[in-house]
Amino acid sequence: MADDNQNEVKDEVVADIAPFDPTKKKKKKEVVIQDTTDDSVGKLAEKAEACTASEGQESTFAGLKKKKKKPIETSILNEESGDAVEDLNERTGEDEEGEGIVLETPSYPWEGSDRDYTYEELLDRVFTILRENNPDLAGDRRRTVMRPPQVLREGTKKAVFVNFMDLCKTMHRQPDHVMAFLLAELGTSGSLDGQQRLVVKGRFAPKNFEGILRRYVNEYVICLGCQSPDTILSKENRLFFLRCEKCGSGRSVAPNKAGFMARVGRRNAGT
């Protein structure tokens, strides 16, 4: 009986198992696509409700007054900022002083007061305006610096003016005119040698030449109006004229005159 029962069970199992067919394909699982539009619509609805709720809260608190904030004391801040700006201006002014740049307009002592100004203050104001408009005339006068004359002895009766030509170039004057003035003032004779040195008869110290050259500069070189050495000496109709290239003024100067000439030669017995 047991064998019969086992055979029946096997027959049922074999009947349940279908024969394998390789031509049949497996069924694919269906992919379910979720619709996100419903979720987005729901989120938008929630945001709209939140906005309406907040507006309702604002409307409920509209009648209440807001607390006023205490005003900040700006005067202290303005003073501190003004001090900082002044410090910066002073520092920049100190930095720019070496370059000669004026950063601020000049302030006068009488500004902001009713007092009368003094003569010295007005004079300073005039010079500051002159320096701004014409610095060449109002600035410090350029001094004419000349080298001292180098004088050597030649023998016992002659003196040699070594740097005579250099001084003539410094003064911008002709050597003949300078030599004529020197010889007339010294009361002697002389000439230029092969090395362009002035050889003068007699014994003379460098101080003698220095004093004569100073008089020559004051008479034939320096302008009496602006004290400028940039002048031109010209001869017109037997007269010498000195014209300044800076201020344009002109004046006539005296010609060279021969000084006292001592007679050294022997006299005849009958004269």
Curated annotation (Swiss-Prot):
<keyword id="KW-0863">Zinc-finger</keyword>
<dbReference type="GO" id="GO:0031369">
    <property type="term" value="F:translation initiation factor binding"/>
</dbReference>
<dbReference type="GO" id="GO:0002183">
    <property type="term" value="P:cytoplasmic translational initiation"/>
</dbReference>
<dbReference type="GO" id="GO:0003743">
    <property type="term" value="F:translation initiation factor activity"/>
</dbReference>
<dbReference type="InterPro" id="IPR045196">
    <property type="entry name" value="IF2/IF5"/>
</dbReference>
<dbReference type="GO" id="GO:0003729">
    <property type="term" value="F:mRNA binding"/>
</dbReference>
<comment type="subunit">
    <text>Eukaryotic translation initiation factor 2 eIF2 is a heterotrimeric complex composed of an alpha, a beta and a gamma subunit.</text>
</comment>
<keyword id="KW-0648">Protein biosynthesis</keyword>
<dbReference type="GO" id="GO:0001731">
    <property type="term" value="P:formation of translation preinitiation complex"/>
</dbReference>
<dbReference type="InterPro" id="IPR016189">
    <property type="entry name" value="Transl_init_fac_IF2/IF5_N"/>
</dbReference>
<dbReference type="InterPro" id="IPR016190">
    <property type="entry name" value="Transl_init_fac_IF2/IF5_Zn-bd"/>
</dbReference>
<dbReference type="GO" id="GO:0005850">
    <property type="term" value="C:eukaryotic translation initiation factor 2 complex"/>
</dbReference>
<dbReference type="InterPro" id="IPR002735">
    <property type="entry name" value="Transl_init_fac_IF2/IF5_dom"/>
</dbReference>
<keyword id="KW-0396">Initiation factor</keyword>
<feature type="zinc finger region" description="C4-type">
    <location>
        <begin position="223"/>
        <end position="247"/>
    </location>
</feature>
<dbReference type="Pfam" id="PF01873">
    <property type="entry name" value="eIF-5_eIF-2B"/>
</dbReference>
<protein>
    <recommendedName>
        <fullName>Eukaryotic translation initiation factor 2 subunit beta</fullName>
    </recommendedName>
</protein>
<dbReference type="GO" id="GO:0005829">
    <property type="term" value="C:cytosol"/>
</dbReference>
<keyword id="KW-0963">Cytoplasm</keyword>
<dbReference type="GO" id="GO:0008270">
    <property type="term" value="F:zinc ion binding"/>
</dbReference>
<keyword id="KW-0862">Zinc</keyword>
<comment type="similarity">
    <text>Belongs to the eIF-2-beta/eIF-5 family.</text>
</comment>
<comment type="function">
    <text>Component of the eIF2 complex that functions in the early steps of protein synthesis by forming a ternary complex with GTP and initiator tRNA. This complex binds to a 40S ribosomal subunit, followed by mRNA binding to form a 43S pre-initiation complex (43S PIC). Junction of the 60S ribosomal subunit to form the 80S initiation complex is preceded by hydrolysis of the GTP bound to eIF2 and release of an eIF2-GDP binary complex. In order for eIF2 to recycle and catalyze another round of initiation, the GDP bound to eIF2 must exchange with GTP by way of a reaction catalyzed by eIF2B.</text>
</comment>
<keyword id="KW-0479">Metal-binding</keyword>
